[in-house]
Amino acid sequence: MTELAEQVSMPEGQQRRGGYVPPHIRNGGGRRGDSAPRGGFNNGGGRGGFFRNNGDRGGFGFGGRGGGFGGNRGGFGGNRGGFGGGMRGRWVDGKHVPGQRNERIELELFGAPEDPSFQSSGINFDNYDDIPVEASGEDVPEAITEFTSPPLDSLLLENIKLARFTKPTPVQKYSVPIVSKGRDLMACAQTGSGKTGGFLFPVLSESFLTGPAEKAANDGYSYQRKAFPTAVVMAPTRELATQIFDEAKKFCYRSWVKPCVVYGGAPIGNQMREMDHGCDLLVATPGRLNDLLERGKVSLSNVKYLVLDEADRMLDMGFEPQIRHIVEDCDMPPTGERQTLMFSATFPHDIQHLARDFLHDYIFLSVGRVGSTSENITQRILYVENRDKNSALLDLLAASNDNLTLIFVETKRMADQLTDFLIMQNFSATAIHGDRSQAERERALAAFRSGRANILVATAVAARGLDIPNVTHVINYDLPSDVDDYVHRIGRTGRAGNTGVATAFFNRDNNNIVKGLYEILEEANQEIPPFLEDCLREVSFSRSGSNRSTRGNRSSNTRDYRKHGGNGSFGQNSRNSSWGSARGGGFGGSTGGWGNDRAGGSAGGWGASNTKTSSWW
């Protein structure tokens, strides 16, 4: 093992990962796995292509245990029995009537206790008890300390228990009482801190307790073909949207709430047919939601809850006109008549000023800072010239013991080239970027999550929001130009209180990020290599624009601008309610893509409708 490899050792207690091979492909092939542009990966010396067509057996799709979403072997809604019938709850005479329990469905949704692909989000959350929290605004409700009824609905508590969530995260401790009191919320929390549960738990709990909004008068055929969701969740990428939908299915189990997901890159016809069966909670990317609104397939008149996840990225990267059209120009109830929740890792001043138009009498919640990840993520910065990166990468992978490794590059071309290189070196690798079709992206993510491909090469499309359990090593093969994007990337490991390693290849081409990188390492009490200090002195002396690598002072990115001279329209008074003192910092970003929202792609995938069967939700 070379000196470079010895610089990065995996955390103690991690075992070498065993490769599970699904039964239907154990005796496969003799040909080499698919090359990177087709989304495949090498399987230990050419045991066969993983993404081959297995016909009616369903393949290794997103149904997971025995088939795809519509395969004849089962999955979510397979021919051996869907999730329909008495397992759906109902709202009858002002009361919520839960559906019947079903062990098979619970295994599909929540997994077996020993199944690593259904990682409990309660693992190591004791590490988060000391994270500082600051809540500002008028009459901030008292935080909860455990999952109880009240304030949460009893059915939701049962589903939370099935998901093996043992205690709320800091953001959930505040978001639950805030939403239950009918308040709007702007939540700024570190990545991996349970933001998805932070809005799903209170929104679903209140929906279970209060039921759907009263629908408009039936106008005939068009009414039957239009969805009237009670809650709308918008996310910037299709990957994040499908991930939220995957979680929503768990917590909507046995309830009257039927979740749906819509996003670009998949056939819109399948998504519309799925909504025809009911849509109470709609998870959507802004582009596809606008399309459905223009087609008259969705009405927002019944929306009680609007959630903007990764809100800073959606607004900052160009989605503001689409979001404003959805919120202000369509039939959504106005501000004050709905609850609006905005969740992200940072809210810089300019984003907060844009967001104020969507919020009313809101509470600003800031949870943690960059330094709070110091116990979970070990950051290593290596000086590597561009010509030496491949060699250094092989050294790191040789020391990784087949653990899940996520490698970030800056360009789509490099993602494919590097994946092909790793396959030629007999590594099981696959790639995800914006030029891949939706089917290829979903297959790549499925392979990586399952461990069949233990290396995923990604561009910024996978940098935000994705929650992939058991990623133990993140490698920044190419450092981003914005320090906040670096923070989001390394946040793919060390999630849910678990430990991980983040390695970055640095050279003189990265001087634009050196100041922010130095500050992050210093705040997190990480080792700062001497070459980084030298580069910082050079950059500071030459004034070569290091300040452009961050959006002003990083500490302001998690602070409520109303408390620091902001001219917001919601009043100037604020009250603090905190565990310890908030320390600023946090996770965020202002650059990077959000994926390709073009038409085309594959039928099926996460949440896509299957024409043979109907799903329980």
From Swiss-Prot:
Reported function: ATP-binding RNA helicase involved in translation initiation. Remodels RNA in response to ADP and ATP concentrations by facilitating disruption, but also formation of RNA duplexes.
Compositionally biased spans, kind Gly residues: 582-595
Q: Where does the record place Low complexity bias?
A: 543-558
Report what the protein is called: ATP-dependent RNA helicase DED1
User: Could you tell me one molecular function GO term of this UniProt entry?
Assistant: translation initiation factor activity
Stretches the record annotates as Disordered: 1-53, 543-617
Q: Which UniProt keywords apply?
A: ATP-binding, Cytoplasm, Helicase, Hydrolase, Initiation factor, Nucleotide-binding, Protein biosynthesis, RNA-binding
List the source organism.
Candida glabrata (strain ATCC 2001 / BCRC 20586 / JCM 3761 / NBRC 0622 / NRRL Y-65 / CBS 138) (Yeast)
Its EC number is 3.6.4.13
Enumerate the residues binding ATP: 189-196
Instruction: Copy the domain comment.
Output: The Q motif is unique to and characteristic of the DEAD box family of RNA helicases and controls ATP binding and hydrolysis.
